[in-house]
Amino acid sequence: MIVYVSRRGDTLLSVARRFHLPPEELARYNALTDPTRLVPGLALAIPAPSGEGRREIVVAACADAALFPLSAGEAMRYATFLCSLSCRMTGEGLLLPPADGELVRAARADGAAPLLCVANLAGNGAFSADLAHRVLTDGCVQDTFFAQLLSVLETRGYCGAYLYLMYLYPFDRERLGAFLRRAAALLHERGFFLLSAAPPRESGAVGKAHDYALHAECADWVVLTTYDWGNAAGEPQPVSPLGAVRRVLDRAVEQIPREKILLGVSNHACSWTLPWRLGQEASLMSNTAAVNLAVAAGAAVHFDEGAAASRFRYRDDAGVLHELWFEDLRSFLSRFALVREYGLGGMSLWTVNAPNPPLMSAQEELFTAAKLI
């Protein structure tokens, strides 16, 4: 694959001619909805043979069953695990799994082991430290939780669980450790896989409840959720800045065996209104939608080399100014390079509901997804 960055004066037709491709194929390969327009700064994927050997890795693809099928079906061919988002828990230890029967069946048909992603999400969809605290501390509630979890896994065709416990109280660190040990014992005894999510340590109080070494002791693979610096509640910045991701990896490999680490890779973009004020929420969209928005708005794209992320500014229909950060092909290739450089076990894609042909093509060119079922 070749990466071509569009310049002022380029058109899709001129770029296609340069690389001897039909313009329709180039547009399809890059998920461009308007093949008649192009803006400067876009990283375009150009099909070409790669001289690099493919390495087998573990790929955990996360998908929201409510949005299936979209592109999740295609992603399963390139995935080891298909993590179904998300099963909520209650303060009584009950589980509220998603209606994902079709997703689970499709995953199995493509050789992707379906996992149930269980998160401490409250009824409003936000992470709740109080909810997690109750499950971690009340023995009866926790007994109910694990009885429910095993029953759901066994009756709905899952191959295991992905525990996504986030924004916990720092003082629940030891309780989380005991919970993970119990989860590992119960699931492994029954032949289930266990993945666990661990936030970046530099995320302050958010990460203090998590012991990387203990995650490694309990889980088959540990997912580093390195895709939340630029988020809906914060100020404009890259979603997954390369320098910050590298710092997280430098610490993580000291406590987690490299082959157990799955690097979180974001497939979403954030758009903030300007001027930004504390309390404003950004809107989320797919990276592909961000590219097409830049084209529609006629906005030049600027690539931040240090962050390996792209941004542009545009005005919406009401004339409001926005700044949008997204991941392009250069971003994905830089993350894939980290997987190789650090000798990681693989990566976790958050999420695969929105189509992203350049991402899938680059992954297929460099890696082979291990198949465990």
Regions found by a protein language model. Name each.
Residues 1-21:
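Primarily a LysM-type cell-wall glycan-binding module
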Residues 83, 144-175, 221-235, 348:
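Active-site groove signature of glycoside hydrolases
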Residues 49-148:
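Glycan-recognition patch characteristic of GH18 chitinases/ENGases
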Residues 335-373:
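Acidic/aromatic/glycine-rich contiguous surface patches that form carbohydrate-binding/processing clefts
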Residues 117-132, 267-335, 364-373:
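Glycan-binding loop/region signatures in secreted carbohydrate-active enzymes
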Residues 57-63, 80-84, 114-118, 161-163, ...:
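Hydrophobic faces of well-ordered beta-strands that scaffold small-molecule active sites
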Residues 63-77, 138-154, 204-213, 327-340:
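Short, acidic/polar
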Residues 91-98, 173-296:
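Substrate-binding surface in catalytic domains of secreted glycosidases
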